[in-house]
């Protein structure tokens, strides 16, 4: 990666869970509640659903790029039904979306998001959030952590831009900000994020290690792996646009 490549970056599109938020702390309890809802009172089914979604019901570890790590509510619902949930996919999707909206109140940030976004905005960067969560939950999270006024674009799986790993959310960010994909850094914690960035032709794919992915699972698809999003301050150059 060359300084020239970094110098062309003018916008940063962030994934939410595992990127802005610590994944295990924020989503471990939510995943267990999702399985409880989907089991419809069958206590023996709950751990089976968790395992089918990629979470070890004993250790709480969630596999990188698994359904629970990277899927949206509709995909998780379909997976749970395939694994034995007696609830119809459409109804379970609605129940999971409602759960994810409520859960925004309990999410745990990686850092002081308002301070970080304020510094990046002061440098002139356009900022966006693209998540497999629903848009309402993303907005509630952005409001809760004081970054809503710093964000130029928000997209969830239900926002009309398509779903990951397709390019739609990145291209929507570009339309909203007037940037070319080559001017965008995609930042995320799993390969869905990196593949979305690649499919849209972003200038930089940044993986962070605060989610379910590891350096081993992400290094092939990312341009660089960072410990967390705070390292962006040193990675990206000062940009003082008017």
Which role does the model predict for each range below?
Residues 6-114, 123:
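N-terminal helical cap/lid subdomain that shapes the substrate entry/recognition surface
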